Amino acid sequence: MELAKSFDPKEIETRWYSTWETAGYFSPTDHKGADPYCIMLPPPNVTGTLHMGHAFQHTLMDALIRYHRMLGDNTLWQPGTDHAGIATQIVVERQLDQEGKDRRQMGREAFLERVWQWKEESGSTITRQMRRMGASCDWSRERFTMDETLSRAVTEVFVRLYREGLIYRGKRLVNWDPVLQTAVSDLEVVSVEEQGSLWHILYPFEQLEGGSEHQGLVVATTRPETMLGDMAVAVHPEDERYRHLIGRHLRLPLSERTIPIIADSYVDPAFGTGCVKITPAHDFNDYQVGLRHKLIPLNVFTLDGKINDNAPAEFQGLDRFDARKKVIADLQAQGLLVETRPHKLMVPRGDRTNTVIEPMLTDQWYLAMEGLAKQGLAVVASGKVRFVPENWTHVYNQWLENIQDWCISRQLWWGHRIPAWYDEDGNVTVAHDLEEARKLSGKEILRQDDDVLDTWFSSALWPFSTLGWPEQTPELKTFLPGSVLVTGFDIIFFWVARMVMMSLHFTGEVPFREVYITGLIRDAEGQKMSKSKGNVLDPLDLIDGVSLTELIRKRTTGLMNPKQAESIEKTTRKQFPQGIPAFGTDALRFTFASLASHGRDIKFDLQRCEGYRNFCNKLWNATRFVLMNCEGKDTGLDETLPLNFSQADKWIVGRLQQAEQGVVQAFDEYRFDLAAREMYEFVWDEYCDWYVELAKVQLSSADEAHQRATRRTLVRVLEAALRLAHPIIPFITEELWQAVAPLAGKTGTSIMHQPYPQADPARMDEHAAANVQLLKEIVNACRTLRGEMKLSPAERVPLLIEGDPSRLADFSPYLLALAKLSEVTILPDRLPDTDAPVAITGEFRLMLKIEVDVAAERERLNKEMQRLTLEIGKARTKLDNPDFLQRAPEKVVLQEKERLATFSATLEKLDQQLHKLG
């Protein structure tokens, strides 16, 4: 097979992905006795597009799946998408808004038809992009959270939980988005630091003392409009300033009500005046205070953020922020506004609408969590579920130990409608469908609850609903528990913990045995990637390349604040003056893997992409060299013919075993960064830079058995290296493997189903490794001497070596080629006493036979002696440190002592050379 002269990623990627998917290579193998290995894809939003976080995590999941597939496991990577209630409804509502339509005018049924239409039109975008990333999911099993089977599972879970007494309806405070007019989860609320004000307001006593008209308590607040719903003023029970006032009453300014002064340890005496207004209906902390003191909450907001009829008439109907202005003005007019101070505060805003989120007292459906949480904590404590890195266990435990009941209802139309029906008297019946509800209630006329379930509710069932639950399917039996969940730390509570609890409750099994928590992809400066910052990168732009014009257009379109466009364009022009070149999928995947350490934040650096694209080119060119020198020739397939393996052959085979050992260990420990580094160093530094060059010398040998062994080693080590790297760079390895495999005696239709390389320690030859290491050091020393003497690459010069001839006997042909020498002379005695520079490598002294610039040589020796003096100082510092001597392994201490001895001996020899120069 003839390879193209240069690597063209796009052509190869398109061809091979189509081949794999058509052939059904992504499906479970179901081989008898194969261990199941299952990863559930965290379902992305159905109408979303692939972002860097997706691409990063999908690369890691795919690497694991491909690795375990090659280990012979029965692998399933279960794909699917999430209906993403709020996100999808907003997109469609914006489309309608542009058409001058309103969903409420359309009606629920017509609106949902429109959403389904949008889902069909754009729902395949993200899965198409996943394919471009090389994701080897079993697409034949793709699921959607609102599929008929998954919806049936959602209904079954709701009904069972309700009948078990765990789901109930109650009036509580929730995060309320007045624009969307729905409850939202904490994850959909973004706290933003903003400049506001702290208003000090006088609350007069109900009964005045001492004739002072405004005698009372001064209360500090950042939200004066909510005072219309105040039910008390709280002070700290130990605050000497106010202890004598506890139990008295105050007149609520601007209202005809009186409210009590209460004592509660929630109050911070040092904040503001030490007096806090308590508004149970509009603040989460105040709500808890209200429960402790039996205060009745008074809601003064409508669902769209206006003042309702519970407030004084002059405020009714005003928008909440207009009401704030009027409250301030009226307080000022009445002389009750004592002071206004600038104050920075954290403002909760909706991540979709950017509106200020209101704590709102509403009727919602809740799931009681205490009992479920105990189960969730127990399986992590027992090790049935393990977090990697382990420190995330603490975060998981902390959330579950402080869990609140879960508000599972949302005031949306798109989603799983709550299976609850009401009769004309408001009595509720929970059932699987209307027919069952009629039977249970004995009523014919029933109205279904308008609310839908929180998107996270159906997501919590994902590990078992996608496998066919509540039916007891073979897939459920085989692939639950799953092997590992790969996800981000931001949804440990919202998704990970809930999957654990739901899976345990309904199947008795944990959903997965391990949870690998990835870091967050940030830009090169460590900033979070966001549209508003203008630092977002599209993974497909890195794969295919993008012009500067198109990149600017993408970054400046659809900004919440259009004024940012100018600065974003300026930054983009500075960062990417030529746009972004095409790196190809493999280079991007290699970059992601190399960044996947166990840290919390990951800085994405475009230069790494360039480096790994160069790696792909290097691998391609090395394979072309191997094919040109091995195709049509004897590569040692006939085991009866003699093979004469060199020290170099044995060394590279041994080094391959070490690489295989390192990569397998790295995969098993989720250290993708170490796996990537091991692959890179072996292929680039050892195989391409050294072994291929040594093999060129061997291929010119007159010994046929030597040539045969060289070709055999070239193709077999390369073939194994391609299998080793396949999980991370699947496309290029498949293309190259197809060409190399026959020469290595391998058969099969795809590298995907080849066995993953396993190290054989018996093939590690320490003697060969030591010899090649010495050869490399001598070659490098010669190259250094050539550089310092400013010899042109074409100029061949003689080399004199002082040392044991028996150790250097086989080196001459390699040295002549790799160090560009005209001849090599090995002297058992001392080198000639000349001014020529001498390099020292272990027990050997090297000299290029050439006239010397004495001044330059003196400078070189001084520099090298300075370096050695520095290294000696570092080694001595370590060895003088009692902690190092006590804690470091004995082998490490011994290595450090050997380093010190070697450096000291070399320094002494260089000093002698320096004196010889005069």
Swiss-Prot record:
GO molecular function terms noted in the UniProt entry: aminoacyl-tRNA deacylase activity; ATP binding; valine-tRNA ligase activity
Oligomer status and interactors: Monomer.
UniProt catalytic activity: tRNA(Val) + L-valine + ATP = L-valyl-tRNA(Val) + AMP + diphosphate
Coiled-coil residue windows: 851-918
Record's keyword annotation contains Cytoplasm: yes
Annotated motif 'HIGH' region, positions: 44-54
Motif ('KMSKS' region): 528-532
UniProt-annotated binding residues for ATP: 531
Record bears the keyword Nucleotide-binding: yes
Gene3D superfamilies the UniProt entry points to: HUPs, Isoleucyl-tRNA Synthetase, Domain 1, Valyl-tRNA synthetase, C-terminal domain, Valyl/Leucyl/Isoleucyl-tRNA synthetase, editing domain
One annotated Gene Ontology cellular component of this protein: cytosol
EC number of this enzyme: 6.1.1.9
Organism field: Nitrosomonas europaea (strain ATCC 19718 / CIP 103999 / KCTC 2705 / NBRC 14298)
Enzyme class, first EC level, given as a word: ligase
Protein name in the entry: Valine--tRNA ligase
GO biological process annotation, one example: valyl-tRNA aminoacylation
Family statement: Belongs to the class-I aminoacyl-tRNA synthetase family. ValS type 1 subfamily.
